[in-house]
């Protein structure tokens, strides 16, 4: 049971790729999977992902509207987008926006898409051209160039296998609360232990409770850090109907869940004999009672086993977040403290991006 989602590995960065595989036996420890994602439409039809390549499978009237949208998009080609909504409308047109992109993404982010800055989703946005969408629909081409179109997943142990393997031969003090980060007489201390430098990977919102007085002179950032927004995730472990999919996206407004992660298909070792499991995701907190009501409406007959709510899973940026974090980094780094990680940097990192950020920090700032 992946309590905060099913994490998979792939990357386009060669340095991350080489570093990662220096610790693992790719053939023996992992399953390589071809991403087979689908979208469960409101009428129960299952459409392959990404939807823009499979419009020909939809109702003829929708196809006709999509063609008109493409003609309009040609007229307005080159017009820049200022937010996520404008990007989606300008890239895919009104029909697909209203049918899939808006309802799905609203369930994920729980806000008007016009209020989502593009910088927040950098590296995660679909970027097909008009030519590609037209050609793929005419020739029924299966696109394999989107994010994580193929990926690696551990044979056993899930994400914990990665952590346990990477932790070998490293001295780690487990089950210890970091309660005090202090600089005194030019020296850094964590829980009284003297350090050369500190790499802060925790949630940035905790930094003031961990630092004694204002020895790092960052109190001016307090209000802005307190106002940083985020989403949590309620992950529901279920037995589901046997299926061939990796992820199933759920734009239907009849229920609150936005996605089923078919973790039972990532590795057969994730399943008990004769059973298929998956994780049904809901944004933010949802009670067990409401979970069960929703499951009755969700396709693939999910049967509740257990669930977990994690308060912090997705950092949310506004147009000023990166500038604020950068200014804070400059201040802290002058004192020997470095921010690193999804919630330390308030960046929507995938696993490989977090690894890349760590490598960049080491190469550019620490190894000097």
What are these regions (language model features)?
Residues 15-16, 95, 205-207:
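Glycine-rich nucleotide phosphate-binding loop and flanking beta-alpha elements
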Residues 57, 208-209, 347:
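Glycine/Thr-rich phosphate-binding loops of Rossmann-like dinucleotide-binding domains
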Residues 176-295, 327, 331:
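Mid-domain catalytic core of redox enzymes
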Residues 1-76:
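Dinucleotide-binding Rossmann-like beta1-alpha1 core, especially the glycine-rich loop
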Residues 62-184, 194, 201:
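Active-site/ligand-binding neighborhood in enzyme catalytic cores
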Residues 46, 186-189, 337:
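Hydrophobic residues embedded in beta-strands of well-ordered beta-sheets
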Residues 50-52, 262-368:
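Conserved flavin/dinucleotide-binding core of flavoenzymes
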